[in-house]
Amino acid sequence: MEGSPITSVAATARRLLADFDSASVTESGEAWSEAEAYAIASELDRMRAARGERLVGFKVGCTSPTIQKQVGIDNPVFGRLYDTGVWHTGVSLNGGRFSGPAIEGELAVKLCADLGIDDTSDDTLMRAIGSTIPVIELHHGAFMATATTTGHAAPRLIANNAVHAGFVEGAGKSGFSLASGKLTISVVEPEHEAAEPRFIDAVGPEITRVVLDSLAWLTKRLQHDNLRPLAGQTILCGSVPPMLPVTTPCEVHVDAGDLGTVACSLL
């Protein structure tokens, strides 16, 4: 980055926060390193905390090798979750608050214990999970629509908080099991040309395996920023099904089998 690193990071973070607030998060094409991108994300976190937003957890993104290839990275990324972007099942949201709304159906966990850098075995991670929750993650999809065609967009993705725009959570279930999981995602868009529901069915061990893999990766990665996952935090663990761009108005429903369901409306 040109100029004073501190000035450049702060100025860039201010601009990206303004883009987030105005729902104009798009792919800018700026050339940052991964380290610079995470520095910008940390400054964004400081700014959001200063205006009263509370950190409630983290998200892991780019868990799929396909998405990693599209954005030009060979590992996942992480973003932060804030109390201002958490809603409960059944909520109706204004689609205008998202820059090209897109959704993912996935599993999240709520932690009942802190995790340190050595706490990455399956058994330790499972003991730290208080509950498993089906969620609908909301994204600024306009960014990804361009990023996945240009490639090498990972640093901009990281700096923009992994284009996370909030999440809707279901009730979930206590604990965690590695038993084969299920996610059925349906989107109903009354004004879409087809006007037929879109469905994605994902069934298999990878649905639950990604939870532990993502949590282990996050626990190690956060050490670089002197952070760690803490009891009480929510961790979005990455989606096995692909991200779905949606048109508004629409109804989104995710069925996670024994773990319950979650639904929302975008108006």
What are these regions (language model features)?
Residues 228, 252-253:
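Hydrophobic, well-ordered secondary-structure scaffolds
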